[in-house]
Structure formats: C-alpha cells, structure tokens
C-alpha cells in the first residue's frame, strides 16, 4: 500500500489530491512541519520534519515523502509524475511526446512559478500580509508572476487543459503551485484563461475531497 508522509496543510496536499484522482488506497502518516512547533525535538513533540524517525525516511527533512513498496521518494511534483506513470490512465502521458510535455510543464511550474507563489502564501501563513514588508513581498512576487502567467494565458487560449484534451498530472501539479497565489484575485482577473482553467481543476471531485479532508485536519497535528 502507498504510504504518504505529510499533512494536508503542506505540499503534501498535491500528493493527496493525486491519490484521490487515481482512486488509490493509501496510508497517511502525519508529519508536521518543524517550523510550526516551539521545540520540534522535545520528547512530547509530534512526529515532525526534524524527528529522527522522519529524518530516516527523508534526510532533507521536508514533506511530503512516499513509500510505495520498496521505493521511497521525495519532492511532491516528482512523486505525482511517478504516480501518474505507475498507475497509468488519462492522468499520465499516452505517448512519449506527452510524457515529455507533462515533465516540461511540471519543471516549469517548479522553476518559474512556485518560487514566487510560495513567497505569497508564506506571507499570509506568517500573518504579515498587512505589514509594509509583507505587502512589498506580495507586490514583488505578483510582478514576477506576470510573465509566466502571460505565457500560460496564451497557452490556454482555445484549450481546456495543459496537455492534450484532458486533465492530466500537469494540470494538477501546476494548479497546486498556483493555488498559493489565489489570495491575489487581481492577478487571476488579469488572466481570464488561467482563472477559468484553475476553477475547472478545483471543481473536480478529487480536489474537493482532498480539501474537505484538509479542512478537518487538526491545526496542531
């Protein structure tokens, strides 16, 4: 059985969404981000990214990780590419060319988009969005996102999905990366194709199931 290490309020959310899309049975092992704890190495601390038991799984001390049989993997976007290929179906590439495009868009999301969207979401997580520094961080990140969003806006003209004529792992990975910036409504209003596309992605039953579980997850775990 697939084991997912992480919590829903983290990058693990995209792996949980993928598992829901594929209809996989999985075990979830809650691993909290160490930054959320006053003393992550205290004897009473819950399992977290600095716990020795988790470091044995992922020496980089980051979530998510998975265990699938004898395979241990890290890096959420790579995990999703693996799960798509492992289980096949419409979320995976149907040709070598499609496989290449799914990988291309996933790497693009990681390199061109996520570095900026993470700045936005962490500003909110740290409750700095109303401070001068926080507002400047968000403004700079939004400016940096204009070019990649313009590229995506053009790519989505006349099409529903990123690759081919169906929802794939590329849509899931990119939608999750962009979700971190959805607090900035003007950014998406300026790119209507992107806005409509991410709404299609987030209307899927598997996404809603993931978000429902995320909403029930105790903050303190």
Name the predicted role of every residue range.
Residues 207-221:
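Terminal-tail/helix-coil boundary detector
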Residues 1-136:
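GST-like domain detector, emphasizing the conserved glutathione-binding G-site
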Residues 93, 97, 105-203:
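GST-like fold's C-terminal all-alpha helical module
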Residues 37-39, 200, 220-221:
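Short Asp/Glu-rich motifs
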Residues 1-3, 154, 218-221:
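Basic/polar N-terminal segments that are highly enriched at the extreme N-terminus
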Residues 19, 66, 79, 102, ...:
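Residue-level signal for nonpolar/aromatic packing positions in well-ordered secondary structure
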Residues 31-32, 194, 214-215:
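Residue-level "edge-of-site" marker
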């Amino acid at each position: 059985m697939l084991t997912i290490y992480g919590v829903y309020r983290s990058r693990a959310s995209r792996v949980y969404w993928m598992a829901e899309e594929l209809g996989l049975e999985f075990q979830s092992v809650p691993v909290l981000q160490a930054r959320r704890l006053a003393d992550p190495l205290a004897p009473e601390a819950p399992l977290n990214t600095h716990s020795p038991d988790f470091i044995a799984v992922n020496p980089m001390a980051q979530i998510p990780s998975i265990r699938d049989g004898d395979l241990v993997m890290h890096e959420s976007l790579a995990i999703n590419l693996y799960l798509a290929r492992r289980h096949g179906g419409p979320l995976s590439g149907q040709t070598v060319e499609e496989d290449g495009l799914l990988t291309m868009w996933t790497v693009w999301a990681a390199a061109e988009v996520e570095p900026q969207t993470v700045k936005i979401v962490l500003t909110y997580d740290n409750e700095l969005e109303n401070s001068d520094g926080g507002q400047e961080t968000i403004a700079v990140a939004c400016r940096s996102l204009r070019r990649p969003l313009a590229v995506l806006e053009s790519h989505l003209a006349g099409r529903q999905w990123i690759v081919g004529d169906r929802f794939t792992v590329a849509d899931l990975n990119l939608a999750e990366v962009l979700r971190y910036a959805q607090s900035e409504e003007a950014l998406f209003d300026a790119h209507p194709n992107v806005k409509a596309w991410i709404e299609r992605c987030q209307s899927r039953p598997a996404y809603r199931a993931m978000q429902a579980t995320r909403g029930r997850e105790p903050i303190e775990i």
